[in-house]
């Protein structure tokens, strides 16, 4: 299913594009499909801007030409995944702890295409998947306490392959936050959390996604569809 979604996303890519390369399992499949198109000559003069060290390493291994985010005035198209998508195309991202670079790339993109499976579609954000908040190591407890006053329950994300917490590409830590009633006003909450001293960025992507491509299984057959934005 993820491969079908990834392959379909590549159909949006045109020769000469500067392309934002997303992170995560579906994005990795997209990067591999992109590399094959470039290798076969079906796509030419593509330059990629990776959203994480993970996607950068994969792109380099597959010989996709890369360009630094700071050196481009805009990105033609960014293709990325999401952890949750609501009917207004507001997103939670950051399950891979790289939402800071993902948001930088998304905000510079002329178009942001989100590729997901049907399980990521939700009516209200944050009722299941926690909101990642990247914090300075010295500030995590202070930020946790402030978020608690906002009715949010925070847990420091712990690593699975090493002792201690997850450390981001920027050298920071991640608080995973669940709010009592979920997130009803993503725009307001994004601003309030980012205004907390010690917070670098949170995983709410508000008014950034232009199109969502969804894969699902229907009668044992993989099906693609693109929902309409509610608002």
Swiss-Prot record:
Coiled coil regions, renumbered to chain: none
Superkingdom of this protein's organism: Bacteria
Enzyme Commission code(s) on record: 5.3.1.6
Pathway it works in: Carbohydrate degradation; pentose phosphate pathway; D-ribose 5-phosphate from D-ribulose 5-phosphate (non-oxidative stage): step 1/1
Pfam families linked: Rib_5-P_isom_A
One example of a Gene Ontology biological process annotation: D-ribose metabolic process
Catalytic activity: aldehydo-D-ribose 5-phosphate = D-ribulose 5-phosphate
Cellular component GO terms, alphabetical: cytosol
GO MF term set: ribose-5-phosphate isomerase activity
Binding residue positions for substrate: 23-26, 80-83, 93-96, 120
Active site: residue positions: 102 (proton acceptor)
Protein keywords: Isomerase
Family statement: Belongs to the ribose 5-phosphate isomerase family.
Subunit relationships: Homodimer.
Protein role: Catalyzes the reversible conversion of ribose-5-phosphate to ribulose 5-phosphate.
Protein name: Ribose-5-phosphate isomerase A
Taxonomic path: Bacteria, Bacillati, Cyanobacteriota, Cyanophyceae, Synechococcales
Gene of this entry: rpiA
